[in-house]
């Protein structure tokens, strides 16, 4: 078995060896070695008789090998093994065999289905060829419509023949290989032809026979006017007979197309239009039958009226246009032929005793005598659609058996069409609103449950708001399950398309490599939050890290190291929360217990975000060590609310310490100046003591001044000590705990090792 593949842009051919081929190749190789060795030895040892001996020996070996080859070929023919390949091998095969699931062939099959629909719709046009010519008082054939109809039928038959030719070159799946997967394709042309000839060839051959064209062309190229009657009857029987193989072939074709392509019409509106087209086609066929049978009943009325004429045979002959007797007015009774049409066989005449039944509307309206095809076609189409839709309830039939059977067929056909076609069309249209109906059912169940559990009104409003917001965002589609059911490679590409640009908007992931971003995108899950929803509360375990895509959130903490501490921040698009989980995931020494949240996060508006769960984040952090980098650490610190709060408090405390040192420096300078002034006063008093005579009054004033200075110095020292004690206590209260972070140095060392 030969197999060809494209390698580096070139087609390479390989050979698959069977057991029989292996035996033949081994024997041939061994023989070849013997021949080479024998020829080599005998050529060296002898030049004469040895050559003749070796030649006869090699001839015997060749005959032996040939007989074994013939036996192998005979076994392969008798075993009946069918050559089968996989569809991938057929694409590079040199044989002109088509894969049944190839896109080009699927397009051909769709076009062939359309051609079958057109063929079924063109065939009823033959029923419009007979016409009652009131101007000539005869029944004739519309020649222009006959040429147009036969041309359309021939074009469709040519396309049908092309389809039949393709059937001989279209592979099929071997039934024995359908155990698993698509199976193997049979590419043997003989097997393909045998399968087609035994299954659908006879049906296709009968359906494509140009019998209506032959009947019409025979009439158009004939010279006898009496050919109108046999042509009319032949068309009626031929079209009805050929409808059977055409419908029989159409049903398996559509089922085969559904197996290979999945569905003929993928969209809901396309499927509804497809079944509506079939309903209109059934109405068209019914209207064409009604027109043809109306002409037949008019013909029956005229033939019955001719029975009372002097020469009934001649009367019947002149009823059809083109008869030679129509031009001779030698007999008196021929002049009374118009009375047959106007009086005896007119649906409007009171003298007519013929009951047309359901065909009276066609005769009285003049449709059977109209030469305008479009108006005639529309009227008959409306009649068929009206009676199929009402199941023939408005039909007033006569006692004629054919008319009664036709009315019964209309009622049964209308019932079947309403059950099948209209039911399928309704199914397609309902698929457009199936999600909306599911949402209504879920909302009703939710309302019943809330009423049963007596939930307060505020909780009910929150539940309704969340359901409404989720419906508006997802339209009832479970996106996560849809994506998870796809293959891993396709799932990764879809996640990358949906999440990559959004993830890159998060500063923490802006500068990471593609592999890490793919791993993060693959594990992100969409989350929706309504207004006033608490995403996480302070002190609760953090089980996911949230990356905001749209909306605004409030982040609040009261853990500031002192009572009454309160810090509030706003989160917007591009921010994240749950950063304690990232610190926990990056720490190789972290336990299984999840970290506690240091902040309370509340949604201020409707929020769309992507969530990364704890285990997924732990896996990404453990698999990709590039996450442990200084740049990530600095970005994380800059955008983390916990680190921002600690940094703000740290800067605030440093600023206060700076202010206290500055105030202390100013106070120290003031005290030094006061001491210098006090020393100057003492020095002045000591120097002036011997020169001035002290009186009691001067001694008293000096001692009073000295006491005042000592008292002010004592008060200043006491106030300074109190301020120092307050400063130390406030310093200890404002000393916030630094947020925990992993040892990046150890991780970097591990990476280097």
Swiss-Prot record:
<keyword id="KW-0547">Nucleotide-binding</keyword>
<keyword id="KW-0407">Ion channel</keyword>
<dbReference type="InterPro" id="IPR018490">
    <property type="entry name" value="cNMP-bd_dom_sf"/>
</dbReference>
<keyword id="KW-0472">Membrane</keyword>
<feature type="transmembrane region" description="Helical; Name=H3">
    <location>
        <begin position="200"/>
        <end position="220"/>
    </location>
</feature>
<feature type="topological domain" description="Cytoplasmic">
    <location>
        <begin position="167"/>
        <end position="199"/>
    </location>
</feature>
<dbReference type="InterPro" id="IPR000595">
    <property type="entry name" value="cNMP-bd_dom"/>
</dbReference>
<dbReference type="InterPro" id="IPR014710">
    <property type="entry name" value="RmlC-like_jellyroll"/>
</dbReference>
<feature type="region of interest" description="Calmodulin-binding">
    <location>
        <begin position="624"/>
        <end position="639"/>
    </location>
</feature>
<keyword id="KW-0112">Calmodulin-binding</keyword>
<dbReference type="GO" id="GO:0009860">
    <property type="term" value="P:pollen tube growth"/>
</dbReference>
<feature type="transmembrane region" description="Helical; Name=H4">
    <location>
        <begin position="234"/>
        <end position="254"/>
    </location>
</feature>
<dbReference type="GO" id="GO:0030552">
    <property type="term" value="F:cAMP binding"/>
</dbReference>
<feature type="transmembrane region" description="Helical; Name=H6">
    <location>
        <begin position="403"/>
        <end position="423"/>
    </location>
</feature>
<feature type="transmembrane region" description="Helical; Name=H2">
    <location>
        <begin position="146"/>
        <end position="166"/>
    </location>
</feature>
<keyword id="KW-1071">Ligand-gated ion channel</keyword>
<dbReference type="Pfam" id="PF00027">
    <property type="entry name" value="cNMP_binding"/>
</dbReference>
<feature type="transmembrane region" description="Helical; Name=H1">
    <location>
        <begin position="112"/>
        <end position="132"/>
    </location>
</feature>
<keyword id="KW-0406">Ion transport</keyword>
<feature type="domain" description="IQ">
    <location>
        <begin position="644"/>
        <end position="673"/>
    </location>
</feature>
<dbReference type="GO" id="GO:0005886">
    <property type="term" value="C:plasma membrane"/>
</dbReference>
<feature type="binding site">
    <location>
        <position position="579"/>
    </location>
    <ligand>
        <name>a nucleoside 3',5'-cyclic phosphate</name>
    </ligand>
</feature>
<dbReference type="GO" id="GO:0005216">
    <property type="term" value="F:monoatomic ion channel activity"/>
</dbReference>
<feature type="binding site">
    <location>
        <begin position="508"/>
        <end position="638"/>
    </location>
    <ligand>
        <name>a nucleoside 3',5'-cyclic phosphate</name>
    </ligand>
</feature>
<keyword id="KW-1003">Cell membrane</keyword>
<feature type="topological domain" description="Extracellular">
    <location>
        <begin position="296"/>
        <end position="402"/>
    </location>
</feature>
<protein>
    <recommendedName>
        <fullName>Putative cyclic nucleotide-gated ion channel 8</fullName>
    </recommendedName>
</protein>
<comment type="subunit">
    <text>Homotetramer or heterotetramer.</text>
</comment>
<dbReference type="Pfam" id="PF00520">
    <property type="entry name" value="Ion_trans"/>
</dbReference>
<keyword id="KW-0812">Transmembrane</keyword>
<feature type="topological domain" description="Cytoplasmic">
    <location>
        <begin position="1"/>
        <end position="111"/>
    </location>
</feature>
<dbReference type="GO" id="GO:0005516">
    <property type="term" value="F:calmodulin binding"/>
</dbReference>
<feature type="topological domain" description="Cytoplasmic">
    <location>
        <begin position="424"/>
        <end position="753"/>
    </location>
</feature>
<feature type="region of interest" description="Disordered">
    <location>
        <begin position="731"/>
        <end position="753"/>
    </location>
</feature>
<keyword id="KW-0140">cGMP</keyword>
<keyword id="KW-0114">cAMP</keyword>
<keyword id="KW-0116">cAMP-binding</keyword>
<keyword id="KW-0813">Transport</keyword>
<feature type="topological domain" description="Extracellular">
    <location>
        <begin position="133"/>
        <end position="145"/>
    </location>
</feature>
<comment type="similarity">
    <text>Belongs to the cyclic nucleotide-gated cation channel (TC 1.A.1.5) family.</text>
</comment>
<feature type="topological domain" description="Extracellular">
    <location>
        <begin position="221"/>
        <end position="233"/>
    </location>
</feature>
<dbReference type="InterPro" id="IPR005821">
    <property type="entry name" value="Ion_trans_dom"/>
</dbReference>
């Amino acid at each position: 078995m030969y197999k060809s593949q494209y390698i580096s842009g070139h087609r390479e051919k390989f050979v698959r060896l069977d057991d029989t081929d292996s035996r033949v190749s081994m024997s041939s190789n061994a023989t070849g070695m013997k021949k080479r060795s024998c020829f080599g030895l005998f050529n060296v040892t002898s030049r004469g008789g040895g050559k003749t001996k070796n030649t006869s020996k090699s001839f015997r070996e060749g005959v032996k090998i040939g007989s074994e080859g013939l036996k192998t070929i005979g076994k392969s023919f008798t075993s009946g093994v069918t050559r089968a390949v996989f569809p991938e091998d057929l694409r590079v095969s040199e044989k002109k065999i088509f894969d049944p699931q190839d896109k080009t062939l699927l397009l051909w099959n769709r076009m062939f289905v359309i051609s079958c629909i057109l063929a079924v719709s063109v065939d009823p046009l033959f029923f419009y060829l007979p016409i009652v010519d009131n101007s000539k008082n005869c029944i004739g054939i519309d020649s222009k419509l006959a040429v147009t109809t036969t041309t359309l039928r021939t074009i469709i038959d040519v396309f049908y023949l092309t389809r039949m030719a393709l059937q001989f070159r279209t592979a099929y799946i071997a039934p024995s290989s359908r155990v698993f997967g698509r199976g193997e394709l049979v590419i043997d042309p003989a097997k393909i032809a045998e399968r087609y000839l035994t299954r659908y060839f006879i049906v296709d051959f009968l359906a494509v026979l140009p019998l209506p064209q032959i009947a019409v062309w025979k009439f158009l190229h004939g010279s006898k006017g009496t050919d109108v009657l046999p042509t009319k009857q032949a068309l009626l029987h031929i079209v009805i007979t050929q409808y059977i193989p055409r419908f029989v072939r159409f049903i398996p074709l559509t089922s085969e197309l559904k197996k290979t392509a999945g569905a003929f019409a993928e969209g809901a509106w396309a499927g509804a239009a497809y079944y509506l087209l079939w309903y209109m086609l059934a109405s068209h066929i019914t209207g064409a039958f009604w027109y043809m049978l109306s002409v037949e009943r008019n013909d029956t009325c005229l033939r019955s009226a001719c029975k009372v004429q002097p020469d009934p045979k001649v009367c019947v002959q002149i009823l059809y246009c083109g008869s030679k007797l129509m031009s001779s007015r030698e007999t008196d009774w021929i002049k009374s032929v118009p009375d047959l049409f106007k009086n005896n066989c007119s649906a409007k005449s009171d003298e007519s005793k013929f009951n047309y039944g359901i065909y009276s509307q066609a005769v009285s309206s003049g449709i059977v005598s109209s030469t305008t095809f479009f108006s005639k076609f529309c009227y008959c189409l409306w009649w068929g659609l009206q009676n199929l839709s009402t199941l023939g309830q408005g039909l007033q039939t006569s006692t004629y058996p054919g008319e009664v059977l036709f009315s019964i067929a209309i009622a049964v056909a209308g019932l079947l069409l309403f059950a099948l076609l209209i039911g399928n069309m309704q199914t397609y249209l309902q698929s457009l609103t199936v999600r909306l109906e599911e949402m209504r059912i879920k909302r009703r169940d939710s309302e019943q449950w809330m009423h049963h559990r007596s939930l307060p009104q505020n909780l009910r409003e929150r539940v309704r708001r969340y359901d409404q917001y989720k419906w508006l965002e997802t339209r009832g589609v479970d996106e996560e399950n849809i994506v998870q059911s796809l293959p891993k490679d396709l799932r990764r590409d879809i996640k990358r398309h949906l999440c990559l640009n959004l993830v890159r908007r998060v500063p923490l992931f802006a500068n990471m490599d593609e592999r890490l971003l793919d791993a993060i995108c693959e594990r992100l899950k969409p989350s929706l939050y309504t207004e006033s929803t608490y995403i996480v509360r302070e002190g609760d375990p953090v089980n996911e890290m949230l990356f905001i895509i749209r909306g605004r959130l409030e982040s609040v903490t009261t853990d500031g190291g002192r009572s009454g501490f309160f810090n509030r921040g706003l989160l917007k698009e591009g921010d994240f929360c749950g950063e304690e989980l990232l610190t926990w995931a990056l720490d190789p020494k972290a336990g299984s217990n999840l970290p506690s949240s240091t902040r309370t996060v509340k949604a201020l508006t409707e929020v769309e975000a992507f969530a990364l769960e704890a285990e997924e984040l732990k896996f990404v952090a453990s698999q990709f060590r590039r996450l442990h980098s200084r740049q990530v650490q600095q970005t994380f610190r800059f955008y983390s609310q916990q680190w921002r709060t600690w940094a703000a408090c740290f800067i605030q405390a440093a600023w206060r310490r700076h202010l206290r040192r500055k105030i202390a420096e100013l106070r120290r300078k003031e005290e030094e100046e006061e001491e210098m002034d006090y020393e100057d006063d003492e020095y002045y008093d000591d120097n002036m003591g011997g020169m001035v005579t002290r009186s009691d009054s001067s001694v008293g004033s000096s001692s009073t001044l000295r006491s005042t200075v000592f008292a002010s110095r004592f008060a200043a020292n006491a106030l300074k000590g109190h301020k120092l004690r307050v400063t130390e206590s406030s310093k200890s209260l404002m000393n916030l705990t630094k947020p925990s972070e992993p040892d990046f140095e150890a991780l970097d060392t591990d990476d280097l090792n």
